[in-house]
Amino acid sequence: MMPGPFELIVILVIVLLLFGGKRLKNVGSDLGNAIKGFKKSMQKEPADQINTKDNIVEAKTTKESTK
């Protein structure tokens, strides 16, 4: 069950009263940087996995050829 627009406004007001505008802005920017870093690492990971798989195949081929 999703809260309606009135409930969301009440929650927003309570959060602003508890944390204040400046601290809430800092938390938002920190969260944005964390999400940006996560997306960046997710884009780099598949390339790393491909290189690792190529290295494993190359290592197996080298090991078999030395027998």
Swiss-Prot record:
TM spans (from-to): 1-21
Keywords from the named record: Cell inner membrane, Cell membrane, Membrane, Protein transport, Translocation, Transmembrane, Transmembrane helix, Transport
Molecular function terms, GO-annotated: protein transmembrane transporter activity
An example Gene Ontology biological process: protein transport by the Tat complex
Membrane topology according to the record: Single-pass membrane protein
Origin superkingdom: Bacteria
Signal sequence coordinates: none
Gene Ontology, cellular component aspect: TAT protein transport complex
Subcellular location: Cell inner membrane
Subunit structure: The Tat system comprises two distinct complexes: a TatABC complex, containing multiple copies of TatA, TatB and TatC subunits, and a separate TatA complex, containing only TatA subunits. Substrates initially bind to the TatABC complex, which probably triggers association of the separate TatA complex to form the active translocon.
Family the entry assigns: Belongs to the TatA/E family.
Function: Part of the twin-arginine translocation (Tat) system that transports large folded proteins containing a characteristic twin-arginine motif in their signal peptide across membranes. TatA could form the protein-conducting channel of the Tat system.
Protein name: Sec-independent protein translocase protein TatA
